[in-house]
Amino acid sequence: MRFSLITATLGRVEEVRCLCVSLSKQTFKDFELYIVDQNEHHELEDIVRNFEKNFIIHYIRSDVKGLSYNRNIALRMCKGEIIGFPDDDCYYEVNVLQEVNEAFSSREEVGFCAVTTRDTVTKRVCHISQKAYLYKKDVLKACTSIM
């Protein structure tokens, strides 16, 4: 498995469905998605079932609220070489995983990369002036929290 993606969610249903739709359209298919559901309701279970035929998706219920706590639940289960943390209100352009894979494949020393993002509400784009890489030797120094 190349990528493991972890989304901890609370209070969002339609947004998670949009994320799953975007992942089902990826040009790079070697990934799995973990949905860690902190909601009181069980509406996301049906969404997960609807996407099981498109890609590997794991549904995890959690009664504990908290982003880092719930990401760590899924992190223990991941099989991917590269871990990503898409928010529950984001979606990926069709080639995002392909581009990230190429970034990691082209330079063995790369340990982290970032991509341009767009706020879906304000439509503001956060441009990265150049390819944003963090080398493996610098990852721990640059992180403010470690999971």
Predicted regions mapped to residue ranges:
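N-proximal low-complexity "stem/linker" segments adjacent to membrane-targeting elements
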Residues: 1-25
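Acidic donor-binding segment of Leloir-type glycosyltransferases
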Residues: 20-61
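Short alpha-helix within the catalytic core of nucleotide-sugar-dependent glycosyltransferases
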Residues: 20-21, 45, 72, 80, ...
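Glycine-rich, basic loop-to-helix element that forms the pyrophosphate-binding segment
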Residues: 62-78
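Short aromatic/hydrophobic "clamp" motif used to bind/position activated sugar donors
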Residues: 83
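The conserved acidic donor/metal-binding loop of glycosyltransferases
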Residues: 87-91
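Conserved donor NDP-sugar-binding/catalytic core segment of glycosyltransferases
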Residues: 95-127
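Short, flexible, basic/aromatic active-site loop/helix in glycosyltransferases
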Residues: 115, 119, 126-147
